Amino acid sequence: MKKTVLSGVQATGSLHLGNYLGAIKNWVKMQEEYNCFFFLADLHAITVDIKPSELNNSIMEVLAVYLAAGLNPDKVTIFAQSMVKEHTELAWLLNCVTPLGWLKRMTQFKDKAGSDQEKACLGLFSYPVLMAADILIYKADIVPVGEDQKQHLELTRDIAGVINRKFNKEILKVPEVLISETGTRIMSLRDGLKKMSKSDISDFSRINLKDDNDLIHQKIKKAKTDHLSFVSYDQETRPEISNLLDIYSSLSEESLEQIIGNYQNQGFAKFKEDLAEIIITNLQPIRDKYLELMNDKEYLLKILHKGAEKARIRASETVNEVKEQFGFVI
């Protein structure tokens, strides 16, 4: 029997190169080997202020990128989180056994809430519990995530343990965390210490998957490096050039040593020019397919409804199992 893999991307804003290299590119490889559930995290998206029209468009955009990048809806289950009501039902049950102190230790809440945490919504605070429900409801064996989500996955494992100990029975599977070595943490093109993000004010901090070729060339040309005139890799002392090397390696599948050797006696200009071309070679087919899919909303909706119907079968089984243990009438 194939192991179950689950992962998702938040449906806010345009997806970028970091989303592709950190998640979607790896998912495409995994779909042949695993029973995969890939969702659009639209419930998580409303933990921050977002316009209804923007949310609706983002859901379609993320789905179109999933498909354009190579996810096959005949091989994997693709769905919007909000279309499977069991996610929120299980999240409530998990909320009722999760100690408040565990959530207070979550660093992402502090980062996203900013300086005035009293004004942050409860949904943002309990975000990790909904994330735990997203994972545990499908009894996922493996959850591929970026390094920044590792703390949330540890919480998920802890919550599963609480439920299993409470009822002295292995009801929820404790998932394994999968963090791949390359591409999981692509940094900003303007600051090598910050993760590439949809929320960054500067559009030149990221390569959006729908950027045209000229804009990609401009962004890479203006990408921050440092005062040294040679290519080398050191994340601590040279974070910006190291980030560009990570991108190059992830897309070309050449080792860092090979790439550095190729540009040993050349400056940044040639390296950046070649990097831009490699990015374009990888992203142009995705962008072309994405634009085609965005013109067929009826097809996209069909994929979402089909995926949600399939996901609900698995999700409802888990929720009923947990509810029965709590003592609810099923």
Swiss-Prot record:
GO terms for biological process: tryptophanyl-tRNA aminoacylation. GO terms for cellular component: cytoplasm. Belongs to the class-I aminoacyl-tRNA synthetase family. Its EC number is 6.1.1.2. This is Tryptophan--tRNA ligase. ATP binds at residues 10-12, 18-19, 146-148, 186, 195-199. It catalyses: tRNA(Trp) + L-tryptophan + ATP = L-tryptophyl-tRNA(Trp) + AMP + diphosphate + H(+). Its main location: cytoplasm. A motif ('KMSKS' region) lies at residues 195-199. Keywords: Aminoacyl-tRNA synthetase, ATP-binding, Cytoplasm, Ligase, Nucleotide-binding, Protein biosynthesis. InterPro entries: aa-tRNA-synth_Ic, Rossmann-like_a/b/a_fold, Trp-tRNA-ligase, Trp-tRNA-ligase_bac-type, Trp-tRNA_synthetase. Homodimer. It comes from Rickettsia conorii (strain ATCC VR-613 / Malish 7). A motif ('HIGH' region) lies at residues 11-19. L-tryptophan binds at residue 134. The gene is trpS. Catalyzes the attachment of tryptophan to tRNA(Trp).
